[in-house]
């Protein structure tokens, strides 16, 4: 259906320009499904945002052991496939303005692409003027204390070892309180930082394995040291865990995994308020995407 904005542009003899929105899905989601695609659809349907979706093609997998696909890549391999596909698409469309939306594993892939855009010498730095902004949900690479205007939760940092710095103002990081993938302690207390570092160390080891489980389960197993899975993860640690902070690390991971449903803060962004006005994470993301799509182009 033709939007009012398109009709108005036609009446004025102007070209109606739509921004591409690259969507980076979560683990085991098919490209073009899940939170990122919901956000794009919401901005189009509710706000008539001048955008169209470009689903990033990747397996969005977490390994082959226990998976119906014997060739399913590990999490780390899956993320890199997504990164390379997105970079290739952007390079192939040098005159196309674009936004990005990513969730969970997809948020990590999106963040790596963002680094290529905002970092001098990055593969996409020369096209940074085409980037209008973006949204992450439950981002493992979230910059410490970064979120978005008016958001309730910004403490801590993403669980990954490599994270964003100097995140552009047009990019918001949405997290639910207690979502361990997007929020581990970062200080200022030394014990908090050490606990966060323990969790990150186990996570970085877990994502290298070809295991069809969620990362939180692998992290908890490694922290508690129970079972064969713990041995596999611990063997990949770059350095020993901090014993003093181990109890706090286990508590954080256990609270995340033991919720009903397990990892609830990470999978309920359509229900939990993230803003003082009661908007959920998905509603806030829709509004932000609509706003950056409608903003005048930078000079």
Residue ranges: model-predicted function:
Residues 2-14, 23-73, 77-92, 115-299:
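Surface cap/lid and interfacial helix-loop subdomains adjacent to catalytic sites
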Residues 90, 97-101:
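Structured, beta-strand-rich domain cores
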Residues 20-22, 99:
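Conserved beta-strand elements of the Class I
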Residues 100-111:
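Gly/Ala-rich beta-loop-alpha elbow adjacent to hydrolase catalytic centers
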């Amino acid at each position: 259906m033709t939007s009012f904005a398109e009709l108005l542009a036609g009446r004025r003899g102007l070209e109606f320009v739509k921004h591409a929105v690259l969507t980076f899905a979560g683990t085991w989601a098919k490209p073009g499904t899940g939170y990122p695609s919901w956000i794009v659809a919401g901005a189009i349907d509710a706000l008539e945002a001048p955008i169209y979706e470009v689903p990033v093609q990747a397996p969005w997998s977490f390994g082959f052991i226990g998976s119906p696909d014997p060739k399913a890549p590990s999490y780390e391999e899956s993320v890199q496939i997504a990164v390379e596909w997105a970079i290739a698409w952007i390079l192939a469309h040098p005159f196309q303005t674009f936004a990005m939306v990513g969730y969970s594993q997809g948020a990590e892939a999106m963040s790596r692409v963002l680094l290529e855009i905002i970092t001098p010498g990055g593969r996409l730095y020369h096209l940074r003027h085409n980037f209008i902004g973006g949204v992450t949900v439950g981002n493992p690479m979230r910059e410490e204390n970064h979120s978005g205007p008016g958001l309730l939760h910004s403490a801590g940092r993403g669980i990954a070892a490599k994270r964003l710095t100097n995140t552009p103002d047009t990019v918001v990081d949405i997290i639910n309180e207690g979502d361990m993938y997007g929020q581990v302690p970062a200080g200022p207390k030394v014990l908090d930082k050490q606990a966060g570092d323990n969790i990150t160390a186990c996570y970085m080891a877990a994502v290298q394995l070809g295991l069809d489980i969620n990362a939180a389960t692998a992290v908890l197993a490694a922290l508690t040291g129970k079972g064969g899975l713990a041995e596999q993860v611990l063997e990949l640690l770059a350095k020993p865990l901090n014993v003093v902070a181990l109890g706090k690390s286990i508590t954080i991971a256990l609270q995340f995994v033991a919720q009903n449903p397990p990892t609830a803060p990470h999978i309920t962004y359509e229900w939990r308020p993230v803003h003082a006005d009661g908007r959920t994470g998905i509603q806030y993301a829709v509004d932000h995407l609509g706003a950056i799509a409608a903003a005048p182009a930078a000079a």
